[in-house]
A protein has these predicted regions:
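Phosphate/pyrophosphate-binding catalytic cores of soluble transferases and nucleic-acid-acting enzymes
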Residues: 1-309
Length: 309
């Protein structure tokens, strides 16, 4: 029998955390983070981790596992998340995978075969130097030329994955997108997608950024910078962190940083929706619909009746 798995996806700021907590309480669930940045210690406010209180009421997994200067690959995430799903299922609890990092979530839910190509330090060094000299956009444009399919999935600032894709192409002569294959899911999965009208979502995102700033995002970034290692790592390019770094270094004003965070978050939400709209298995619900939660609850109960309180 395939292990059961509830998957909750959607754009940033739409309310995935609140829904996952509610469903976890109703269906004896445990939550697995599907966010590529929540694995890092000290990156709490900017990644919108569940609060310590929320984490104390419902078990959470794949959060606060690594230092921000440690590397973490999709393949590592796939292996860890699948292990957690089996462990949770063995406790007769419902595994709930929640997040907005499409590539990570798809890699877990589907039989996503990763390209098995050994890293080449010389190629990586060469590409890193090119990025330092000409900027991240230069490498992203190069990737668009050799692997447009994979380039569309990556933000120009996602330097680590851009370098990996170019490295694979240089070593094999084949685009990475042709070496990653998706087939049937090894899980009995139910996909729930949350959305809302775009203008309302954008307003919600703007308010959430204001809340993050009030909670101490600037202080969080200053503490990370004080380690002396954070700025050199890909994690420092996450939305909210890269803008605050530029403000702290005196390159932009506070108002410019706030505006950039909000704009970057809205653009990210748009990309997330585009990614998830490709997945036909997702049952979409409008968060603003007063009947949405009841309908979601019925859907989950129908799929996974044995977990009901």
């Amino acid at each position: 029998m395939k292990p059961d798995l509830l998957v909750i996806v959607g754009p940033t700021g739409v309310g995935k955390t609140a829904l996952s907590l509610s469903l976890a309480k109703a269906f004896h669930g445990e939550i697995i983070s599907g966010d590529s940045m929540q694995v890092y210690l000290g990156m709490d406010i900017g990644t919108a981790k569940a609060s310590p209180e929320e984490q104390s009421t419902i078990p959470h997994h794949l959060i606060d596992m690594l230092q921000p200067d440690e590397s973490f690959s999709v393949q590592q995430y796939q292996e860890m998340a699948r292990q957690k799903i089996v462990e949770i299922q063995n406790r007769n609890h419902l595994p709930i995978l929640v997040g907005g990092t499409g590539l990570y979530i798809e890699a877990v839910v589907f039989e996503y075969q990763m390209a098995k190509v050994t890293e080449n330090p010389a190629i990586r060094q060469e590409l890193t130097e090119l990025a330092s000299k000409y900027g991240n956009e230069f490498l992203h444009q190069r990737l668009q030329q050799v692997d447009p399919t994979h380039a569309r999935k990556l933000h120009p600032n996602d330097l680590r994955r851009i370098i990996r894709a170019l490295e694979v192409y240089q070593l094999t002569g084949k685009p990475l997108s042709e070496q990653q294959h998706r087939s049937a899911s090894p899980f009995e999965a139910l996909w729930i997608g949350l959305t809302m009208p775009r203008l309302e979502l954008y307003d919600q995102i703007n308010r959430r950024v204001d809340q993050m700033l009030q909670m101490g995002l600037e202080k969080e970034v200053r503490q990370l910078l004080a380690t002396g290692r954070f700025e050199k790592h890909t994690a420092s390019q996450a939305i909210g962190y890269k803008e605050m770094i530029q403000y702290i270094k005196g390159n932009i004003s506070y108002e410019e940083a706030v505006s950039s965070i909000k704009q970057g978050s809205r653009r990210y939400a748009k990309r997330q929706l585009s990614w998830f709209r490709r997945i036909p298995e997702i049952h979409w619900f409008d968060k603003t619909d007063v009947h949405a939660f009841i309908e979601i609850n019925h859907l989950v109960a129908g799929k996974f009746p044995s977990y009901r309180e």
